[in-house]
Amino acid sequence: MASISINCFFTPQALARPSRTRKIFAKPDKVSGRTRSPRKTKLQREVELKSRGGDKLQPVSDAGGEATTYTRLPPREDYYDVSLLSSSYLKVSEEVKLSESNVARVEEKIETLREIEEEEKEKEVKSYDDDDIWGNYRRLDVFEGSSRSIDEDDEDWEDEVFEYGDETDAEKDDSEGSELKDGEVLCFSGEEEEDEIGVKEKGVPAVMRCFDRAKIYVRAGDGGNGVVAFRREKFVPFGGPSGGDGGRGGNVYVEVDGSMNSLLPFRKSVHFRAGRGEHGRGKMQSGAKGDNVVVKVAPGTVVRQAREVGSEVEGEEGEEKEVLLELLHPGQRALLLPGGRGGRGNASFKSGMNKVPRIAENGEEGPEMWLDLELKLVADVGIVGAPNAGKSTLLSVISAAQPTIANYPFTTLLPNLGVVSFDYDSTMVVADLPGLLEGAHRGFGLGHEFLRHTERCSALVHVVDGSAPQPELEFEAVRLELELFSPEIAEKPYVVAYNKMDLPDAYEKWPMFQETLRARGIEPFCMSAVQREGTHEVISSVYELLKKYRAANAEPKALFDQANENLDHVAKKIDKERRAAINEFEVFRDSGTRAWHVVGAGLQRFVQMTNWRYMDSDKRFQHVLDACGVNKSLKNMGVKEGDTVIVGEMELIWHDSANGSSRPTDSNKTSTDSVRWPQWK
């Protein structure tokens, strides 16, 4: 098959839209003594496509007029060569002999076409690099390179092949792979890659997570900026300032939602930001308040402030983080972060001495923090025990809960809650916790993730598997894990329920188990949760313990009333810190440098709210530094000409004037060349 080689030079414009080159193919008159058919059959095109792609044809029997065809495709040569297969394998493969010679003739015809194609490729002009061309673009040969079969009648078909740049890594890999000898198999081992990357530590699968811990980011809204405006009205020549104040930023609230039983919503929603207050306007119009944001949590959520990255307390395992809020009952609502105050407009700065103030404040930035949320289920009774002891079955019998029940350990992966009703006004919430193993207090198994849920339970039910080899040891192991995790949990009242009495093994071991526990002063109960036998006695006994516990510990209600009164104590504390007096500050010097730091919550807030676009703001700032005693403290500590004074986010340069007065000036300000104001450095 003939082709035309075209040499072309690429320019940047040509690369953007290369010209299309038509290829002209010469039609051979005869191939192997036969006239070529006007159109190729589908079989011919597929075989020709395979031959052009570089794949070897499958072996054909040498017998004249007969071809060997497999009922299934032979193995790919990318993995191993067919020639390596033994003759026994070929005999086992099912074969079909074709008496007609059509297939053999097609194969013969294709071999002839391949020979002609190889001869034509040898005559083609190879591409070469032309280093003398500006732009260092490559001189290329456009030649036949299509792997698609071409019909005679397909005259409008065009093929274009372009190369640009050096050979890619993928092409190099392909060329290296093509140099393998016949019969060679290239194997890749994942051990080297595993050694380089290392074994990553996997966490608990998503299906096994309770989502009782979460870390979220909350930020109150910033206050709106004040505006500098003046009254412009007909027949009012001196209207005076009319700039309004900015609106207050939105608050961040935490509210208990009774419909939630986990912290799953915080898996994807992590950031909670309140709206910013609107800026002030003319005509004494104040900006609107920003939108509040409400973070809804499940009952029993404990809110702690997360440790900041790089803090000194980070990494200390023994120290508990401070508890900000403990929300137990649905409907509780606490103000966590108050919004920033809006900046004042120029109307707020007018006075008898300054009737035309050209000054306004920025809005106060809203506070922000990272919070650690921990959920402790609020349940009256907790069901504990070893895996596959029948805890979920007991919960499904005594309540309307439908936990997953199966005859294998760790069927329960998440805590389940159920409500048990005795009378119209007598109910109790029962929690089914996953099974505990030896070492659960150290994090072994699933127990460490859920043991803390028992801290809020008033009573416990120990379910013992009667079919276990030694039920007494199983009971003692669970008790030991509870004591090691928290001695307070071990001191809570509990009831022992000996389960699976419907099994012969459990029935035989019951007398010995009962005698062992009675010797320790414990009266156990026997039951069969599957048969619903003995469960009423167990729950009735637990309910009696619960009533006694509530009567003896009547202070939780008082604590609840006190908590309702102090739910906003976090916001009050933050607001008090932000309202610190401006004269409360500390000055210290960096060792080895000429930098002085003035640290104070009031001063930092003042610097942040100062709008430095107005010259009156600079004058006011210098006056505040003199009034609160910053300049005096710096001179007493030995500040010198040219030293850097850092107040909040501002860096100033200290200068001593000729008349003996000293003051820091802003190092970031440009020169104003004003007669009234000194030149800013």
UniProtKB/Swiss-Prot annotation:
GTP binds at residues 385-392, 410-414, 432-435, 499-502, 528-530. Its main location: plastid. One of its GO terms (cellular component) is chloroplast stroma. Pfam families: DUF1967, GTP1_OBG, MMR_HSR1. Residues 208-378 form the Obg domain. Mg(2+) binds at residues 392, 412. PROSITE patterns: G_OBG, GTP1_OBG, OBG, OCT. Disruption phenotype: Embryonic lethality when homozygous. Embryo maturation arrested at the late globular stage. Its cofactor is Mg(2+). GO terms for biological process: chloroplast organization; embryo development ending in seed dormancy; response to light stimulus; rRNA processing; thylakoid membrane organization. Residues 577-656 form the OCT domain. Keywords: Chloroplast, GTP-binding, Magnesium, Membrane, Metal-binding, Nucleotide-binding, Plastid, Plastid inner membrane, Ribosome biogenesis, Transit peptide. Residues 25-72, 657-681 are annotated as: Disordered. Specifically expressed in leaves. Residues 658-674 have a biased composition (Polar residues). Residues 43-55 have a biased composition (Basic and acidic residues). Residues 1-32 form a transit peptide. It is found in: Plastid, Chloroplast stroma; Plastid, Chloroplast inner membrane. GTP-binding protein involved in membrane biogenesis and protein synthesis in chloroplast. Functions in the biogenesis of thylakoid membrane and plastid ribosome during chloroplast development. May be involved in the vesicular traffic between the chloroplast inner envelope membrane and thylakoids. Possesses GTPase activity in vitro. Belongs to the TRAFAC class OBG-HflX-like GTPase superfamily. OBG GTPase family. This is GTP-binding protein OBGC, chloroplastic.
